[in-house]
Amino acid sequence: MPVINTHQNIAAFLDMLAVSEGTANHPLTKNRGYDVIVTGLDGKPEIFTDYSDHPFAHGRPAKVFNRRGEKSTASGRYQQLYLFWPHYRKQLALPDFSPLSQDRLAIQLIRERGALDDIRAGRIERAISRCRNIWASLPGAGYGQREHSLEKLVTVWRTAGGVPA
């Protein structure tokens, strides 16, 4: 469960994202995925313990994650990229990269995709479709990374307490 107190369907959607992004069941996580750093091409899982800022905020090099040399700074339960962190940290007045800040940022990204009302109303398939350009693991994202099936994610969402329309 996310740490933020929010609508049941939104909490379930956040849990679904964590499963989809591979952080909820990450082999090293000590904090429900909030401490996960993207796994690079070397395949070595990694976590962080300092929540004062995004793990890539102070010059840490991005991790190469495929043979094409593409790099990522994805971190935390929702694999949030450092590229967008300074903007949202300021916009949302986030004091740190704590679990609560990560939840608030994820909800803001969902809001910007116009999916919050769909999630609240239980229109999960539509919400997933609206958010697929944010999270590479969602079906139809098209980032060339592993995508989960819509059926699997709907099942995860329902198991996490999501109530369909």
Swiss-Prot record:
Residues of the active site are: E21
Q: Which GO terms describe its biological process?
A: defense response to bacterium; peptidoglycan catabolic process; viral release from host cell by cytolysis
Q: Name one GO cellular component term.
A: host cell cytoplasm
Q: Which family does it belong to?
A: Belongs to the glycosyl hydrolase 24 family.
User: What are the subcellular locations of this protein?
Assistant: Host cytoplasm
Q: Which reaction does it catalyse?
A: Endolytic cleavage of the (1->4)-beta-glycosidic linkage between N-acetylmuramic acid (MurNAc) and N-acetylglucosamine (GlcNAc) residues in peptidoglycan with concomitant formation of a 1,6-anhydrobond in the MurNAc residue
Would the keyword Lyase be found if you checked this record's keyword annotation? yes
- This chain belongs to which protein, by name? Endolysin
Protein purpose: Endolysin with transglycosylase activity that degrades host peptidoglycans and participates with the holin and spanin proteins in the sequential events which lead to the programmed host cell lysis releasing the mature viral particles. Once the holin has permeabilized the host cell membrane, the endolysin can reach the periplasm and break down the peptidoglycan layer.
Q: Which cysteines are joined by disulfide bonds?
A: none
A single GO molecular-function term is: lysozyme activity
> Might you give the EC number(s) for this enzyme?
4.2.2.n2
UniProt keyword list:
Antimicrobial, Bacteriolytic enzyme, Cytolysis, Host cell lysis by virus, Host cytoplasm, Lyase, Viral release from host cell
Protease as a keyword of this entry, yes or no, is: no
Q: Which SUPFAM superfamilies match?
A: Lysozyme-like (SSF53955)
Subunit info here reads: Monomer.
Entry's HAMAP family?
A: ENDOLYSIN_LAMBDA (MF_04109)
